[in-house]
Amino acid sequence: MTTELWIVRHGQTKFNVEDRVQGMANSDLTDKGIADARALGRGLAQDGITFDRAYASDLTRAADTARLALDAAGQEKLAITETVGLREENYGKYEGQLTNDFSQELFGLPNFTAALLAHQLTLAQIADATRAANEDRVPNRAEDNAMVQNRLDQTLRTIGQEALGEGDRRVLAVSHGTAILMWLNFIGFDTGGQEMLHNASVTGAVFDGAHFNVVDFDDLKWTK
């Protein structure tokens, strides 16, 4: 038996628009973020896709995305389990900072997005450098690459095992872009060097109790 994990990045937020570091820091969904979450739900419903259980990061932007999508899909009564395991990377003292200031301070690169797109930086390098730069904080809550990967992998495995144990066929899990990409690298999926996921995109994985088989990546077809 297998179960399907439909892993969704949250909708667009105010910090996304303002280009601010957004890990544990939270900002509300924009009007577009709300509309995209609802469009995702409607698109899934039109394709006859329903969920047996639903999970979301306990950060508001993810939990709100999950609720909006499920309500739009006609699954208003499906409860959402919020979990810290699906959270975004913790950036410590850099939370809420403009991404260009963050990139300049840590790497001497003035344009964060351009550096990512040009592959001057990887998500792993950013996370490892961020935790190292937070060593002056006690406790140091910033996460490096391995910490994020292990946390998300353990969480998704637990979710998958619970679904299999209950005979659930399909699970929604709303998380965050960087964390999802780090996890995909961890399980050996080739992201093609992609360092950003689209808001409200779907990444699908089939779980057999031991292994994940990624069958869809950064898919926006249900929001259109």
Where are these regions (language model features)?
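Short glycine/proline- and acidic residue-enriched helix-loop micro-motifs
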Residues: 110-147
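Phosphate-coordination/substrate-recognition cap region in phosphate-metabolizing enzymes
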Residues: 42-117
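Active-site-proximal alpha-helix that buttresses catalytic centers in soluble enzyme cores
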Residues: 2-3, 8-76
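Short beta-strand scaffold positions
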Residues: 56-57, 150, 174-175
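Acidic, low-complexity terminal tails and accessory targeting/binding regions
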Residues: 2-3, 89-101, 161-170, 181-224
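Alpha-helix capping/helix-boundary segments
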Residues: 61, 179-180
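A mid-sequence, solvent-exposed acidic-amphipathic segment
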Residues: 134-166
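Active-site glycine-centered loops adjacent to acidic/histidine catalytic or metal-binding residues
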Residues: 10, 85, 176
